[in-house]
Amino acid sequence: MSTSAPIDEQLTDGAEALSAEEVIARMVERFHPRLVLASSFQQEESVLIDLLLKVEPGARIFTLDTGVLFPETYATWRAMEERWGIEIEAASGISLEQQAAEFGDELWKREPDRCCALRKVTPLKETLSGVDAWIVGVRRDQAPTRAGTPKIGWDEKHGIWKAAPLADWSERDVWRHIHANDLPYNPLHDRGYASIGCTHCTVPATDRSGRWAGSDKLECGLHG
């Protein structure tokens, strides 16, 4: 794994003109089986899992199980596994008990960045250390911090390639695909949750402001 940005014109040339399906196909052709899709069981991943498995039924999919996901999120996890007949891997950090013992109770209130680092960033780093590329559900219109997301680019933070096939999709595009294909999705979206994370740090909202409400935090550290 290299942290310096390589030049790979065959991979990146014309990527912005590709459809989501074409981006996924290009990534699979180049990197499978050293390619993973990261799922947080939000609406984007319903679409991505559907598209990815049509290209490569044996694709590897994982999620960051923080131990404090919503019951509805765990139910969506099971529903997706049943729908596609797959097993979605769980990547986890230290236990909640160990975290409390080392850093005190309710770390998410006092130091949300550290909590995200322990429960998300560290297990993500460990998972990505064994692959050459990953696929994510980032869309440019989700937040100002994501406006410049390329469809295929070099992830300097993790030293691997990263694809965001839905980068230019709107929320309406996502839901159109879900309903047209009768895909399972997280029911919290029907209750006003536009973005879904851990139970302690997520409230209903029309955008990512529902994450870490009351603070200026918009990202958990996975994508920047």
Language model region names:
Residues 1-224:
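Nucleotide-activated chemistry modules centered on ATP-dependent adenylation/adenylyltransferase
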